[in-house]
Amino acid sequence: MRILHCLRAPVGGLFRHVLDLAGEQARRGHDVGILADSTAQNALTARLFSEIEPLMSLGVMRIPMSRQPGIGDYKAVRATLSHAQSLSLDVLHGHGAKGGAYARLTRRALRARGQPVKAFYTPHGGTLNYQPGTAQAAVFLTLERLLERFTDGLIFESAYAARVYRERVGQGPAPQRVIHNGLRPGDFIT
């Protein structure tokens, strides 16, 4: 399979999850790439990207992605689409609200152009962190519901995230599954 992981912030647990998943997919023989925000950068991020890049046969691409929604998202989605179209993908896997939106909007555009790509989404919190009843939550949760029609599957890293998603967004048509992130042998102190 040809898989592209899309995420905004290459930091924290979300980034760790993407690195683990993309690395394991590559080791199992898949062609894998990562598309992430270019404005979030520190020494650790640079080191982790340099370590994973040799495994990424589809490359590591960095584009500017703002944290909050704005006009810059149009340019970023177009860049995501252009990059994804050049890769002849089987799967777009969006991580977090922004990566999930870019992956699913790109899936919609590629399908309209005859490319049968599938889009999977792992929320990792994102829009689920907004307090219900607020204007921000209403906007972001409505966007989640609208984007679900371009989603072939939802993957949650915990039962908690799956439950909160169902409570706040609802049980849409996309299949949902909990897949816990694993630990590597180096994560244990011996």
Residue ranges of predicted features:
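Short His-centered aromatic/hydrophobic patch
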Residues: 94-100
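Glycine-rich phosphate-binding loop signature in dinucleotide/nucleotide-binding domains
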Residues: 83-90
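A short, active-site helix/loop in glycosyltransferases that binds the activated sugar's phosphate group
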Residues: 149-178, 183-188
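A short helix/loop element that forms part of the nucleotide-sugar donor recognition site in Leloir-type
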Residues: 47-51, 79, 189-190
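N-terminal strand-loop element at the rim of the active site
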Residues: 5-72, 161-169, 176-178
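Active-site proximal beta-strand in glycosyltransferases
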Residues: 3, 91, 108-128, 144, ...
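Nucleotide-sugar donor phosphate/pyrophosphate-binding loop at the beta->alpha transition
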Residues: 72-78, 117-120, 127-146, 150, ...
